[in-house]
UniProtKB/Swiss-Prot annotation:
Protein name: Ribonuclease Z
Cofactor(s) it depends on: Zn(2+)
Assigned keywords, A-Z: Endonuclease, Hydrolase, Metal-binding, Nuclease, tRNA processing, Zinc
Binding positions (Zn(2+) 1): H61, H63, H153, D176
CDD domains the UniProt entry points to: arylsulfatase_AtsA-like_MBL-fold
Reaction(s) the record says it catalyses: Endonucleolytic cleavage of RNA, removing extra 3' nucleotides from tRNA precursor, generating 3' termini of tRNAs. A 3'-hydroxy group is left at the tRNA terminus and a 5'-phosphoryl group is left at the trailer molecule
Pfam families: Lactamase_B_2
Binding-site list for Zn(2+) 2: D65, H66, D176, H240
Enzyme Commission number(s) of this protein: 3.1.26.11
SMART domains: Lactamase_B (SM00849)
Organism: Mycobacterium bovis (strain ATCC BAA-935 / AF2122/97)
Protein family membership: Belongs to the RNase Z family.
Length: 280
């Protein structure tokens, strides 16, 4: 069984009720943080997961709303890990991830220096190992495997999605993307697909062109549902709602998805949890 928790279902626009884009996937004793939107560690704390307890951080792409809290994750995982010889925190992402991590650690350079000077048991900077992928196997530990495939969020490139499998259960996390063959293949037969969605019917009515531009490289609710249908997934989990879903509007979004997908559809606020079991 895999457990999905929508830590942050928001967007680049700050929302008092929604943290930035981030999803937690738990597979047995392993915990994977997929993207690091603002407020993610507070949301993770609400479900009993601390930064030092993460098995790896998976980044779908390097847009600011998906990495806004990366620095906090790196520093907090370091200062709250009291092991004598802590293992490096794996960061898995597309090309460019190593540069972003290096720049983030440099930005926190003064803080890192202060802590090393103050605490005798902190003698080195945060131990991090970065792995960059565009496709193929990315993880195989203790019965959990992760596979990567490219997505299409152009002009943001490269971008990737993840397929996590454990004990016969599988979940795919698409990140921001328009429909594409590589995502269909990655998600083929998965038990669950976590997909970011926007309401293009609403966004196109907003006068500012910069806002309308987001329709170019995100999937609508119906497009995400059609991807789920083509891939033959069991459950569609929607997240990263643009615009934010208002109180009582969940069924509108669910109904739109149901025009393209007849399976289970999950629409939830932050901390919404979905158990994923292998389909028999």
């Amino acid at each position: 069984m895999l457990e999905i928790t929508l830590l942050g279902t928001g967007s680049p626009i700050p929302d008092p009720d929604r943290a930035g884009p981030s999803t937690l996937v738990r597979a047995g004793a392993q915990a994977f943080l997929v993207d690091c939107g603002r407020g993610v560690l507070q949301r993770a704390a609400a479900v009993g997961v601390g930064a030092a307890g993460l098995s790896a951080v998976l980044l779908t792409h390097l847009h600011s709303d998906h990495i806004a809290e990366l620095g906090d994750v790196l520093i907090t995982s370091w200062v709250t890990n009291f092991a004598a010889d802590p293992a490096p925190l794996p960061i898995i992402g597309p090309p460019g991830t190593a540069e972003v991590v290096e720049a983030t650690l440099k930005a926190f350079g003064h803080d890192i220096g202060y802590r090393i000077a103050h605490h005798a048991d902190l003698t080195t900077p945060p131990p991090i190992e970065v792995h960059e992928y565009t496709a193929g196997p990315a993880w195989d530990r203790d019965g959990v495997t992760i596979r990567v495939a490219p997505t299409d969020h152009r002009p943001v490139t490269p971008t990737i999605g993840f397929r996590i499998e454990s004990d016969g259960a599988s979940v795919v996390l698409a990140g921001d993307t328009v429909p594409c063959d590589s995502l269909d293949q990655l998600a083929a037969g998965a038990d669950a697909l976590v997909h970011t969605v926007i309401r293009k019917d609403i966004v196109t009515q907003i006068p500012q062109q910069r806002v309308k531009d987001i329709c170019d490289y995100h999937s609508s609710v119906q497009e995400a549902a059609a991807t789920a249908n083509r891939a033959g997934v069991g459950t569609l989990v929607m997240t990263h709602y643009v615009p934010a879903i208002g109180p009582g509007q969940e069924e509108q979004w669910r109904a739109l998805a149901a025009t393209e997908f007849s399976g289970r559809i999950e629409v939830g606020n932050d901390l919404h949890r979905v158990e994923v079991h292998p389909r028999r």
